[in-house]
Amino acid sequence: MAAQALALLREVARLEAPLEELRALHSVLQAVPLNELREQAAELRLGPLFSLLNENHREKTALCVSILERLLQAMEPVHVARNLRVDLQRGLIHPDDSVKILTLSQIGRIVENSDAVTEILNNAELLKQIVYCIGGENLSVAKAAIKSLSRISLTQAGLEALFESNLLDDLKSVMKTNDIVRYRVYELIVEISSVSPESLNYCTTSGLVTQLLRELTGEDVLVRATCIEMVTSLAYTHHGRQYLAQEGVIDQISNIIVGADSDPFSSFYLPGFVKFFGNLAVMDSPQQICERYPIFVEKVFEMTESQDPTMTGVAVDTVGILGSNVEGKQVLQKTGTRFERLLMRIGHQSKNAPVELKIRCLDAISSLLYLPPEQQTDDLLRMTESWFSALSRDPLELFRGISSQPFPELHCAALKVFTAIANQPWAQKLMFNIPGFVEYVVDRSVEQDKSSKDAKYELVKALANSKTIAEIFGNPNYLRLRTYLSEGPYYVKPVSTTAVEGAE
């Protein structure tokens, strides 16, 4: 088959209008294993295919792109970088986006290869074209360009090429295209900044991080909403958080939240600002963040009462994030009856809100109630039990009812709540004392789809692996759980058949 492909490739090179040959080559290549093509890589002459891309013929272009995609995979990245550099440069300025995407996918292979990436770094014109691809209308092209530049910047040589040459001017020039492109460049800068303190230093020296932060705290509410997402990404790293604190950005974000009550347009940016603090609290110290920025906790409680489902959803998510570790749980516990009212509200919403918000409420409840075995002190167990009780008059029945609704996502989210409390003795006693609950847990006929079967299996696993389950559920039920566990999530009980003498 590889020989046939090579013969067709030679035919394509020989003819002026080889449309039928391209179709045949495209068809043959689908059947040739990649390892066979690799063995013939030295024989592959791709010049004619690249030349055909310059003809304004839609079908030829589509066929050539597909053929090149396959053949280039058979070539080593170093070979592509050294021998096809002119074709790569032309590909990046081709009017057809599929050609640009093909070219960028090859550049993606090259920058992943430590031997080949040098060829890119030494090609200023190619780097410039990659930068200008960020400004194109096609999002896939822009994303691929951002990914390649981000990968290039992982090395010292890459950082220098991007920030200590004319390329930085090209980057700033591209930013002026429009708002969308400017945000794409910010996205690239944040990706690079997140790698290391040194990378962040290059980005801050360029002035682009400062520009992003200036827009974040500026007057345009829509710009704020976009910029806070990128700043939140930067805050995922320790050095990023340090930088934001040193520059006073965290204090500024807090002050904007304080002033949000008098801003009629605060609903545009407030959810993002609250999310920022939620993530900050979990990554650093919930207690320190909540004590230093009390407006954050205040605003979360306020937003759970909002009639705006966007606000409520973000507040619920943030409570879940905040309560995902013990320190965060204790911070919430200190708010006393206010948090009890919040739990009651979340419990109510998990039953009565639109489906999407129900799921977010259930996820938050799971996060709040989960306690790893090594952290199950008497005080913390009493706390999670009291939280569970605050959710509803009969919370176990509430979640069991939700789990019986015909929405797989809701069903899984309710099972996740049971799984979160499954290793806590007080919850095991509750489950055991509810008539039919143990039977419900080991009944495989309830779950029909894969995600539901997986969720049920996680519940069984959490129960079966608990040290207190045999004592509370009793040995027969414990053995049923162990059997379920050993059979796996997708076990189907074989149907027994009885042979009857004389039956046809």
UniProtKB/Swiss-Prot annotation:
The modification N-acetylalanine is found at A2. It comes from the Eukaryota. Transmembrane segments: none annotated. GO terms for biological process: proteasome assembly. The keyword Flavoprotein does not apply. One of its GO terms (cellular component) is cytosol. Pfam families: Proteasom_PSMB. Keywords: Acetylation, Chaperone. PANTHER family: 26S PROTEASOME NON-ATPASE REGULATORY SUBUNIT 5, 26S PROTEASOME NON-ATPASE REGULATORY SUBUNIT 5-RELATED. Interacts with PSMC1, PSMC2, PSMD1 and PSMD6. Part of transient complex containing PSMD5, PSMC2, PSMC1 and PSMD2 formed during the assembly of the 26S proteasome. Rich in dileucine repeats, which have been implicated in trafficking of a variety of transmembrane proteins. Acts as a chaperone during the assembly of the 26S proteasome, specifically of the base subcomplex of the PA700/19S regulatory complex (RC). In the initial step of the base subcomplex assembly is part of an intermediate PSMD5:PSMC2:PSMC1:PSMD2 module which probably assembles with a PSMD10:PSMC4:PSMC5:PAAF1 module followed by dissociation of PSMD5. Belongs to the proteasome subunit S5B/HSM3 family. This is 26S proteasome non-ATPase regulatory subunit 5. It comes from Macaca fascicularis. The lineage of its organism: Eukaryota, Metazoa, Chordata, Craniata, Vertebrata.
